Amino acid sequence: MHCFPCFSSPKNKKSSTTNETNDNNEPKPDDRRRAEETEEIEQSEGTSLKIFTFRELATATKNFRQECLLGEGGFGRVYKGTLKSTGQVVAVKQLDKHGLHGNKEFQAEVLSLGQLDHPNLVKLIGYCADGDQRLLVYDYISGGSLQDHLHEPKADSDPMDWTTRMQIAYAAAQGLDYLHDKANPPVIYRDLKASNILLDDDFSPKLSDFGLHKLGPGTGDKMMALSSRVMGTYGYSAPEYTRGGNLTLKSDVYSFGVVLLELITGRRALDTTRPNDEQNLVSWAQPIFRDPKRYPDMADPVLENKFSERGLNQAVAIASMCVQEEASARPLISDVMVALSFLSMPTEDGIPTTVPILSFKDKSMSIALSRHDSNLVSPPPELATEDDKSSTSSGEESSLESEKESVSKNEYKKKHEEEDSSMESDDESDSNSEHEKDQPPKPIDEKNQAQSLKIKYRYSWEDIDVNDERLSSKSSQKSNDESTSSRYDSDRDQDEKGKEEEEEEEAEEKHTHIEHIDSSKTDDDQSVYFDNDDDSGDDNGGSLHRIKSDVAIDSIKE
């Protein structure tokens, strides 16, 4: 009687234990799945990402019907769907099953993507990791892709004008710059192309289909992806990536340059309907890059030349830098973004209303743009310092010249007291030399824009300073000479008044002078020297003047 309760109690305890575990002492699949979902929810609490079941997304896309297919990329297919719970229209990307990440690895990457938030990136709103299914849910962009508007426009739609194209390029560069410089860790796009740039109703671009790859060690443009699988699109992929799978941030810059060329030319990156030498857009454009006169021929014919020639030259220069063969020769996307900010500005008659001073991290971009337009490059700060120094030095030199002139005036006066005829000849020679020196310098020809930049920022600043110094010194010397000559005239008048007194004294001392002259005939040159008593060695004074003795004797006899 008492045995039944005793045996029944242990039996019930054992049965409850078998319900929790299987024969191998492991949790049942339902419990394991419930635990994983709980862990996913806990990890997703820090983000705004939603977790969807496969059934929800299958219902939203009508079981992934062909009519809902939006496109197919390197990572899978994209379907248009409507969430039954909220009525929101979304884009569901069903990733390929080969090479699938584990659930935790996939979740970690998706959570990292969920933290990326920029106006020019398509927003990730949720994901699904149900069994072997891996799906991403994005906001739906209704305007279509850049490829549709450029290469497959609707019959009733107008072609994009030049300003709109440059604004799209600038905004796309902003999104790519966010992935390269702002995201942590940096994200390599890997497959940037016109079909992955989506446009909303306002033609604002949003980059899509980026980022499902871990990034390896490294910094800056040396950041490399771990995956060795080449996922890019031929025509957009950088040469180093196509040849050896070497993927860096500069690989994205190359792809962006191809997209920019598409916006400029209206051609596809790869068009098999064209002649063999024109099928690849970059190969066709490379020879034209070397001849700026052919740049207008690159413009999309549908633009009907309604663009600024200067803007076209700048855009082509930027694109040529981006598609360089060597990755190290390409600019940073941040520099590309800064350069495009100028081209995307509102214009009046093809000229921007305001001209910014551009600042680049890499000098190569500044050099490339300066070859086409001097308005984008400001004079180096060193030139301003040199100008200040030259003005100061010119002031010092002018003061020195004035001092020299004051000294020369005294000497000038002494010379004119002794010899009138020699000074008259000197005045004539000085006036002739001054007339030759006062000829103005030839003006600098800045009609050629490409040449004016070189003249303005390398040579003309120094030449103008030197010419200004010479002109200022010449003018000061001329004014000093005029004042000296006026003073000499007054002194000569005084000398004439005292001439009569000197003649009387000379008459009294006539005999003494004759004796002095006779004694001087013993010299070799038979001459008398008058010394100015100045040992300074200056060219303007201190020289010895000679008067022939026979002339002096004749004057005395008279």
From Swiss-Prot:
This is Receptor-like kinase LIP2. It is an enzyme of class 2 (transferase). It comes from Arabidopsis thaliana. Its main location: membrane. GO terms for molecular function: ATP binding; protein serine/threonine kinase activity. PANTHER family: OS07G0668900 PROTEIN, RECEPTOR-LIKE KINASE LIP2. Disruption phenotype: No visible phenotype. Lip1 and lip2 double mutants have a reduced male transmission. Residues 1-45, 372-558 are annotated as: Disordered. Interacts with PRK6. SUPFAM superfamilies: Protein kinase-like (PK-like) (SSF56112). The gene is LIP2. The modification Phosphothreonine is found at residues 53, 233. Involved in pollen tube guidance into micropyle. Participates in perception of the ovule-secreted peptide signal LURE1. Keywords: ATP-binding, Cell membrane, Kinase, Lipoprotein, Membrane, Nucleotide-binding, Phosphoprotein, Serine/threonine-protein kinase, Transferase. GO terms for biological process: pollen tube guidance.
